[in-house]
From Swiss-Prot:
It comes from Chlorobaculum tepidum (strain ATCC 49652 / DSM 12025 / NBRC 103806 / TLS). Belongs to the EPSP synthase family. MurA subfamily. Phosphoenolpyruvate binds at residues 22-23. This is UDP-N-acetylglucosamine 1-carboxyvinyltransferase. The keyword Ubl conjugation does not apply. Its main location: cytoplasm. Cell wall formation. Adds enolpyruvyl to UDP-N-acetylglucosamine. The active site is at residue 117. It is an enzyme of class 2 (transferase). Keywords: Cell cycle, Cell division, Cell shape, Cell wall biogenesis/degradation, Cytoplasm, Peptidoglycan synthesis, Pyruvate, Transferase. GO terms for molecular function: UDP-N-acetylglucosamine 1-carboxyvinyltransferase activity. It is found in: Cytoplasm.
């Protein structure tokens, strides 16, 4: 197993480009299953564990793929299976994205219930509701979702999501683009990753109106085609790198971004006393002499993202005063708190919110990652902690950050990856 060894106390300074977004790449890769026509070329695909797992899943289904220098090529003309097996799906919850496109293309599919980060309930009920609304019969048997179209193809319908869901919106889009008639999605997710998926599907030949709003109108088409496409940037990675500068008293410019997609995070940084400027496709953050405490509540886009909640908590351990952190999306996403407290933080969990007492001097020790963003949180804490911090189980980190230790090293961090043996 790998661990990251961090000697804290180094300022994070310099210029670094943002990687492509994992959260948009995965549904885009799934959408290639919609058509046998041609070869897709998806640029700016991040080289991550989750992406590699998804490529493995496509290969299992019979797709031909090549992946080099962040360019992914996919051809799904000769698929040999419509079943997504447990052995691959268990590794990440995003595997559920194959449900919609396989059902739309073949009329039936069998997908194992997904895995991924272990925090709080993440039911597949909304995905099943979407497929049933579109005219499929869905059952769950022996850990598999079995879905079959009643008739020759899915049928357009009106779907009003009870809550905003990125995953269910993505699956609804992919399932409905070739459905007969018109589908209306109300309370659709607003996240940039959904807008990116819409743009990808439109380039393939789909007809989607209302892109960038909570109401999407999809007129089904008979066929789609393979295309070339460039993925968007990873706004969570960008926010994490900005946090690294803020927590260490440094200054960083992150390039190849769309600053407007970071608006809520940049506003929070400004409230904390950081100087934040944008210039075209770049964001520059310079840390203040003292950080102000800033309360945040994680909600669906365009509000503060749940995927930045843990990193913000690490930052607030260094603020001069107390701050509160609430997560309205995943109420139990606080697995990082005990590990932060091991480093010397003083954080209390009160019902479904956390109270961070700052500032606290952190001291390096061994800490264990429990999920993707908790891993990033602990790395940030290690950057400012005295002495040496060892972050164990960084396979979680590798699911969503592309060579993060190399990027941080380029910005001045003393961080290295080492092998270790974990006792059972």
């Amino acid at each position: 197993m790998d661990k990251l060894v961090i000697r804290g106390g180094k300022q994070i300074c310099g210029t670094i480009p943002a990687s492509g977004s994992k959260n948009s790449a995965l549904p885009i890769i799934a959408a290639t299953l919609l058509t046998p026509d041609g070869t897709f070329a998806i640029d700016r695909t991040p080289d991550l564990k989750d992406v590699r797992t998804f490529i493995q899943l496509l290969n299992y289904l019979g797709a031909e793929t090549s992946f080099e220098n962040n360019l992914l090529k996919v051809s799904t003309g000769q698929l040999k299976s419509i079943e997504a097996p447990y052995e691959l799906v268990k590794k990440m919850r995003a595997s559920i994205y194959v449900l919609g496109p396989l059902l739309a293309r073949f009329g039936h599919t069998r997908v194992s219930l997904p895995g991924g980060c272990a925090f709080g309930p993440r039911p597949v009920d909304l995905h099943i509701m979407v497929m049933e609304k579109l005219g499929a019969t869905v059952t769950i048997e022996k850990g598999f979702i079995n879905a079959r179209v009643n008739g020759s193809r899915l049928r357009g319908t009106h779907i009003d999501f009870p809550i905003s869901s990125v995953g269910a919106t993505g699956n609804a889009l992919m399932a409905s683009v070739m459905a007969k008639g018109t589908t209306i999605l109300d309370n659709a997710a607003l996240e940039p990753e959904i807008e990116c998926l819409c743009n990808f599907l439109v380039k393939m030949g789909a007809k989607i109106d209302g892109i960038g709003t909570t109401t999407l109108v999809i007129d089904g088409v008979d066929q789609l085609k393979a295309v070339e496409f460039e993925n968007i940037f990873d706004r969570i990675e960008a926010g994490t790198l900005l946090c690294a500068a803020a927590i260490t008293g440094g200054s960083v410019t992150v390039t190849s971004v769309a600053p407007e997609q970071l608006a809520s995070v940049l506003d929070a940084f400004r409230q904390s006393g950081c100087t934040v400027t944008t210039n075209g496709n770049s964001v520059t953050l310079t840390a203040p002499a003292e950080l102000n405490p800033v309360d945040i509540t994680a909600r669906p886009y365009p509000e503060f993202p749940t995927d930045m909640q843990a990193q913000w908590m690490a930052l607030m351990t260094q603020a001069r005063g107390d701050s509160t952190i609430i997560d309205r999306i995943y109420l139990e996403r606080f697995n990082h708190i005990p590990e932060l407290n091991r480093l010397g933080a003083h954080i209390e969990i009160r019902d479904n919110w956390a109270l961070v007492h700052g500032p606290q001097e952190l001291t390096g020790t061994k800490v264990m990652s429990t999920d993707l963003r908790a891993s990033a949180c602990l790395v940030l804490a290690g950057l400012v902690a005295k002495d040496t911090t060892e972050v164990l189980r960084v396979y979680h980190l590798d699911r969503g950050y592309e060579a993060i230790e190399k990027k941080l090293t380029a910005l001045g961090a003393d961080i290295r990856r080492e092998k270790y043996q974990e006792f059972s």
